[in-house]
Amino acid sequence: MNNMKTFKFLTALFVTSILTACTMDAERPVNVQYIDKTDSTWQQHLQKIQKIQSYQAKGQIGYISPTERFSSRFEWQYQNPKSYTLKLYSLISKSTLWIQMHQSGMTISDNNGNQQSAANAKLLLQEIIGMDVPLEHLAYWLKGQPAMNADYQVGTNHLLGAFTYHVDGSQWTADYLTYHSNNSMPENILLKNDSTKQTLKIRVDEWIY
C-alpha cells in the first residue's frame, strides 16, 4: 500500500499511539552561568567532537507543536549530510517509522510497507509527520557541536551550554541540560523554536562512535 492518504492515516495512528502521560518540561533554564569560549578544556572537547564524522545515538524524543504532540523511542544513524536514518518506534505498540536521507532525497516508510519519497526532505517531513525540524542540522546539534556562525555559550562543566541558530528565517535555541559522565556527550537536550512554537526534548541513552 503506497497510497498517500492511507500512509498519512497510518502515520497519524502511529503518532497517536506513542503519546505518553509523561510531562515535558518545555521551559528554558534560567540564571545559568557560562564561561569564556576560549576555555582550553572546552576547546579540546570541541576538537574531539568535530572529529566524530559518523555516529549512532539511541534514546527518547518528545515533540510539541501547535498541531502535533508525541513521544517516541528513537535510533539515529548518521554518516554524512546525504546519508542518515532516524527510526521512531512506539513505546506501547509495534508501530515504527523510518526517515531515511539518501542521495536523491528523503524516504519515509513504516512497518506496514507504506512509503513515500521526495527530493525536498523538508516538505516531506512536514507533510507526512508534521515536523518542521531541520534534520540536517540535528546531526551536529545532537552531539553538542555548535555551527560555525552560531551564537553559543559554554557551561561551567566546560561543555556546550546553549546556542542560538537561525534556520530558514526562524530562530532555534538549544539548552544542554545534562551530559553523560563517561564520555562527555549530551544526555538531555531542549530545542525550541518560538516563532514556529516547536519544542523538541531529547534524551540520549546510548552513544556509539
Give each language-model segment a name.
Residues 83-131:
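An acidic-aromatic
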